[in-house]
A protein has these predicted regions:
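Bacterial N-terminal signal peptides
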Residues: 9-18
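N-terminal hydrophobic or amphipathic helices/low-complexity stretches enriched
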Residues: 22-74, 85, 95, 251, ...
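Noncatalytic luminal/extracellular "stalk/propeptide" segments of secretory-pathway proteins
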Residues: 47-172, 276-278, 295
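Soluble metallo-hydrolase cores and metallopeptidase-like ectodomains found primarily
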Residues: 99-101, 114-150, 232-337, 353, ...
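Metal-dependent peptidase/peptidase-like ectodomains
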Residues: 107-111, 124, 149, 155, ...
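Extracellular/luminal Protease-associated
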Residues: 109-232, 237-238, 333-336, 440-441
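Acidic/histidine-rich catalytic neighborhood of metal-dependent amide-processing enzymes
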Residues: 177-178, 182-184, 208-209, 322-420, ...
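His/Asp/Glu-rich mid-to-C-terminal helical/loop segments that flank catalytic regions of hydrolases
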Residues: 346, 353, 357, 467, ...
Length: 547
């Protein structure tokens, strides 16, 4: 134990020396700085930037030291804002069994199912819980939709389809057509199952509506699972959360008289009502190792001159997934997260440098949040317990996973059609003959899958731009190919690594555009708002009333 502590101290001392020496030789060019920050943050030395690890500590130290080098002010007395977390690791002795009238099938973890618990206890058990199919598992009064109406699922296991009904039909009158709503997110489905009193919630993975392959599920939800520390130890969550492959579910359903395709069809019927898959039960024993840790959001401010209590916010998440426990010694085990999200952190560090060199009327805040990969928890904690009045944030700009595409003719707005920030972006792009490209993949629900949503649902206007897809060299076809290859081959895997051949001109382009917009906002009296009819506008209006 003492040897391990000494090693850790020496490791962190070496980190400090490394950070100090490197920061003294920062490049004079944007491209050079971006390459340095991305390559460093995604290097093996940072161990995949998992919270609660030495690599995570190195990441936090690196970002805070960079803020310090730019003479930015901390919030209160420290750049580090506490985010108390729990880490729950499933032990190998845990199991999940699906049974049909006495015939047991012990599921193969990783290949067939992935499961965990967010209840911070050493041991949890479910015995012979009846399995109920609840369609999309949605209660949405505004869409006149309630999958749980008329059914009692207390103590039972619910099987849930991913995404929402609009995706399956493409009909705009059904939810938002192919564009995913928040009701399509896995986070919502687990939350709603808990509100309904279910003991277990299993989401069916199908690649197209999920927007990622099964490998992402394997890498994201196996190993230590992080959550915010809760006074009730997570008692308000279901006991078991998990995913099951669509093909695996289909095999299990053979005994019940249903198949996966028939369930999907039934779930779309206007008269759909949740129903038990008679004879099918779930049993599970969950053995956990529970550890409590203090993670951190890293925040810095460049104070404004005349309106220092009004803020322009730049955000990016610093965490990634760490290492794969199951990797063989000869295999690469580090999920470096170069695109996701060393690129985003590099972007806000570049904004920090630029704004450190100018004076603005309003303050500029730079926020690197933790626990994004665990469900946007760091940004949620900041927004729930804000160190500043969120109503005084003029606008937020989120950077998350910028692909190295090179120069583009466009900038993609994820969640297009939301706020007046898009008008500012369109005007700025038009000056150089470029254009705004609406989200080409609205069915993937990216707008609800990044940290800006923690601020949006509290009324703060945010812009989430995903670079561009219409490449100067190669057009849209080349841009979409880069996105598809990354999503399938690298996202949430060991292949997400920095390459010196990356063309970062597209990221540089984006930073230039957003800097111009944000600098104008920082020296104006403008208060951009959500468009009329947007779900967040009334929240913003109420928060600004009387100010």
């Amino acid at each position: 134990m003492k040897i391990n502590k000494i090693y850790s101290l020496l490791f962190l001392l070496g980190i400090s020396i490394f950070i100090t020496s490197c920061s003294d030789s920062l490049s004079d060019t944007t491209d050079g700085r971006l390459r340095y920050w991305i390559s460093t943050l995604s290097s093996d030395e940072f161990e995949g930037r998992a919270p609660g690890t030495e690599g995570g500590q190195l990441t936090k130290n690196f970002i805070s030291k960079t803020f310090q080098d730019f003479n930015l002010d901390p919030i209160d007395d420290s750049y580090f804002l506490d985010v108390p977390a729990s880490e729950i690791t499933l032990k190998d002795s845990s199991y999940l069994t699906l049974s049909f009238r006495g015939n047991d099938r012990k599921m193969i973890t990783g290949d067939e199912v992935v499961f965990w618990t967010k209840q911070a206890r050493d041991y949890r058990k479910i015995r012979d819980s009846d399995v109920v199919f609840v369609g999309y598992g949605i209660v949405a009064p505004e869409y006149n939709w309630n999958d749980y109406e008329g059914v009692d699922v207390k103590g039972k296991t619910v099987v849930i389809l991913i995404n929402d009904p609009g995706f399956a039909t493409g009909k705009l009158r059904l939810f938002n057509g192919r564009s995913m709503t928040y009701y399509g997110r896995w986070t919502y489905k687990f939350e709603e199952a808990a509100r309904q009193g279910a003991a277990a919630a299993i989401i069916v993975h199908e690649e197209e509506p999920a927007a990622y392959p099964w490998s992402v599920v394997e890498n994201s939800w196996q190993g230590p699972q992080l959550d915010l520390q809760r006074d009730d130890l997570g008692a308000d969550r279901v006991i078991l959360e998990g995913w099951i492959r669509d093909s695996t579910l289909n095999d299990v359903l053979n005994f019940t008289g249903f198949n996966y395709d028939s369930l999907k069809e039934i779930a779309l019927e206007k008269t759909f009502s949740a129903f038990p898959l008679r004879g099918l039960t779930l049993s599970s024993e969950i053995h956990n190792k529970v550890r409590y840790l203090q993670s951190h959001n890293i925040a810095a401010v460049k104070k404004g001159i005349s309106n220092p209590d009004e803020y322009i916010l730049f955000m990016a998440h610093w965490d990634h997934l760490g290492e794969i426990d199951s990797a063989q010694p000869s295999e690469d085990s580090i999920m470096n997260g170069a695109v996701d999200n060393a690129t985003g952190v590099a972007a806000i560090l570049e904004f920090a440098k630029r704004f450190s060199e100018v004076e603005t009327d309003r303050s500029i805040m730079f926020l690197a949040v933790t626990l994004e990969e665990s469900g946007l928890l760091g940004s949620e904690y900041f927004a729930k317990y804000p160190p500043i009045d969120l109503a005084n944030i003029v606008a937020g700009f989120n950077y998350d996973g910028i692909l190295p595409t090179g120069l583009t003719n466009d900038m993609v707005v994820v969640g297009y059609g939301a706020s007046e920030l898009e008008d500012l972006l369109e005007n700025e792009l038009a000056r150089s003959g470029r254009y705004v490209n609406p989200d080409p993949n609205p069915e993937k629900g990216y707008f609800y899958r990044s940290d800006h949503i923690s601020f949006a649902k509290r009324g703060v206007p945010v812009l989430y731009s995903d670079g561009g897809f219409d490449l100067v060299a190669g057009g849209k076809e080349a841009g979409f190919l880069i996105e598809e290859e990354y999503r399938v081959d690298a996202y949430h895997g060991v292949a997400d690594e920095y390459d010196e051949s990356w063309d970062l001109e597209g990221l540089n382009q984006s930073i230039d555009v957003i800097f111009n917009i944000s600098n104008d906002l920082a020296n104006s009296q403008q208060w951009p708002n959500w468009y009329d009819g947007n779900e967040f506008k009334s929240i913003r209006d109420a928060s600004r009333e009387g100010k």
